């Protein structure tokens, strides 16, 4: 990445890339997988069979995702440290910080978290598209005497993925911790009487394409409501997991979601980078951002009456480089005319 660009803008570029890649898998990759699922052999405009397309996508995406995390870890995070912006790992928490985090866990996390033990009476839960989850290895018996062995912890979507530590607990700068670190640290408190042998984050991307025939739809609103709900639980198209996840757990998740190695991405960092966009609101460092851009207004549209400007000829606005305000003024004046 170009180092002359502001640091936080480079971070945002990486995060926007993640968001775009999510949508690519939800729609484009899902479309190719659907064609394979139903045995459609038709090739696309590029004369490539869906299986060939998917193989090529996997090859390229694995390379660029690896590069993305390498840039994040070896460049962006290191430069943020130099700028006194810290993502504090669990093993670096002080006693005071640990006490504060534990209180946050008890007051904010515990009331809204719902771990699910995996046993014959608790099958694998339905996990929402792109949600952060943890697969946990357990040893021992739960409060009901059951040997669970494994559990799933869905991270509460109502909680922020980044939490800022109080300034009085730190030695200056901006100090942030991941919600995933909090859940990792205190996961054992969610399973009384059992020992947590391992806790690993993962995320499933699902088919979010909406497919229906407009000519056959009688109630468009109800159809859209149904399609929007089903987007959360469509067929899995990608598995992302912490690279430290044991192979046995990876294979368990692959089997559960009917995915193979080509659809699995082992990452060295947070599995949902888009949630790091909260950094914009948590870190007030304008020196690490682009200067705010103020869109201009063409000279003829600066007057009080937009209709006078239009009578003199057509006016072209180039959004976002020029302000949208004249359009709003036009509607407001037309409503009063």
Which residues does each PLM region occupy?
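N-terminal localization/anchoring segments of enzymes in phospholipid and broader phosphate metabolism
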Residues: 1-337
């Amino acid at each position: 990445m170009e180092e002359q660009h502001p640091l936080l803008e480079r971070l945002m570029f990486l995060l926007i890339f993640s968001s775009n890649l999510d949508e690519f898998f939800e729609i484009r990759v899902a479309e190719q997988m659907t064609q394979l699922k139903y045995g459609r052999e038709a090739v696309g405009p590029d004369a490539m069979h869906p299986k060939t397309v998917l193989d090529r996508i996997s090859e390229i995406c694995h390379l660029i995702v690896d590069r993305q995390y390498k840039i994040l870890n070896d460049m962006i995070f290191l430069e943020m440290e130099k700028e006194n912006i810290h993502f504090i790992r669990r093993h670096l928490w002080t006693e005071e910080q640990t006490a504060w985090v534990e209180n946050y866990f008890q007051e904010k996390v515990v009331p809204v978290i719902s771990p699910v033990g995996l046993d014959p009476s608790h099958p694998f839960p339905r996990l929402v598209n792109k949600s952060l989850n943890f697969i946990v290895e357990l040893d021992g018996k739960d409060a009901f005497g059951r040997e669970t062995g494994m559990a799933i912890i869905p991270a509460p979507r109502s909680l922020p993925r980044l939490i800022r530590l109080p300034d009085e607990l730190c030695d200056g700068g901006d100090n942030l911790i991941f919600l995933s670190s909090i859940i990792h640290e205190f996961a054992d408190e969610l399973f009384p009487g059992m020992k947590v042998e391992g806790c690993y984050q993962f995320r499933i991307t699902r088919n979010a394409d909406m497919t229906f025939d407009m000519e056959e739809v009688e109630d468009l609103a109800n159809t859209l409501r149904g399609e929007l709900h089903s987007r959360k639980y469509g067929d899995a198209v990608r598995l992302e997991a912490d690279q430290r996840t044991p192979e046995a757990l990876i294979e368990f998740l692959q089997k559960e979601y009917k995915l193979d190695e080509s659809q699995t991405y082992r990452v060295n960092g947070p599995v949902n980078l888009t949630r790091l966009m909260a950094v914009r609101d948590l870190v007030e460092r304008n020196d690490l951002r682009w200067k705010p851009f103020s869109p201009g207004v063409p000279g003829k549209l600066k007057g009080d009456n937009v209709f006078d400007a239009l009578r003199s000829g057509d006016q072209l606005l180039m959004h976002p480089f020029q302000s949208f305000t004249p359009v709003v003024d036009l509607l407001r004046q037309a409503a009063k005319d």
